[in-house]
Amino acid sequence: FISYVNSDTNQISRFANELFNTHIKTDTNDNSYKHILYDNHKINHLDKEIITKIDLAAIVWSATSFRTYLQCKRKFYLQNILKIKEHTLSLKPKAYELGDIIHSILEDYYKDFANDDFSKIEELFNKYKSLNPFLILDLEIWKKKLYDFYLYDKDRLKHRKIIALEKNFECEFEGIKIRGVIDRIDKYEDMYEVIDYKTSSTLSVDTLKNYEKTDDFQLEFYYLAMSEIYKSDKIEAYYYDLNNTVLIKEIALDKKLELLTQKFKELKEISNTEISFSKCEDKSNCTYCAYKTICNRE
């Protein structure tokens, strides 16, 4: 079919017949294609309760998937069990893409740290700007931010050395397998420093007063992996706040490890039982969730 508007103010182009071998009839055939244009498709929301048996203890958990499970069991079920993927038909960058680029720039820069001139970082920014036209302004802003980081970190590394970048790991804790990628590992004398880069302007770090409500165990996963890899307990964990060029120590590490132990024990207790994958109570979690349409939480 050839579709066109035929009304008092619009009609088919006079060049249309020159483009096709057959003569185009201008009488309407609305009935032939109205199901394409005019049908109202009803969205089926997943409102029913989901209860099923799943061996949660057999899953290899990342800090991200575990956080999703703690925040919203329904999202975890859709994303990690049914593996329903978010659509990618968009030219505009996803929220996480800028952070991924900054991570990649820092990884590439420190791979060849012998050349510690800021011009190398500028070259890397130019490379990623050419690949991501929608992020040109954001990357230009971040290039200026990373200059402060470059000066601070250059001085800091006079007294320590980087021993690993983007370190993959898989290990076991309390009978449950965990995996992930550590952004960076430094060594200062006999102390290992595990570092997680953060680009968020709203970085919030758990304290000894509020850690019991946390759902973020990323540095704890890293600490456990480091203990396994380097067979040492001389490990400190830090967030590297790139927005403000400051290292923030995970002061609640020991308490959060105790809490993680408790939560993993709970996982094992309910594994292979009827588990309810309910929607989260805190609807603020739904604001940027890829599954909010399915859950009827738009």
Where are each of the predicted segments found?
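C-terminal accessory regions
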Residues: 1-24, 28, 269-291
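A non-catalytic, helix-rich entry segment at domain boundaries
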Residues: 98-168, 172, 251, 258
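Non-catalytic protein-protein interaction segments used by genome-maintenance enzymes to assemble
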Residues: 164-230, 264
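C-terminal, active-site-flanking charged/polar segments
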Residues: 11-31, 213-230, 245
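Short, contiguous acidic/charged loop-to-helix segments that flank catalytic cores in large enzymes
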Residues: 88-93, 97, 133-138, 172-176, ...
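Short acidic (Asp/Glu) and glycine-rich catalytic loops that position anionic groups and cofactors
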Residues: 57-59, 78-86, 103-104, 122-130, ...
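Conserved helicase core region in the C-terminal RecA-like lobe
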Residues: 1-8, 65-68, 180-186, 295
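C-terminal, charged and often intrinsically disordered regions of DNA end-processing helicases
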Residues: 16-111, 161-163, 282-283, 291, ...
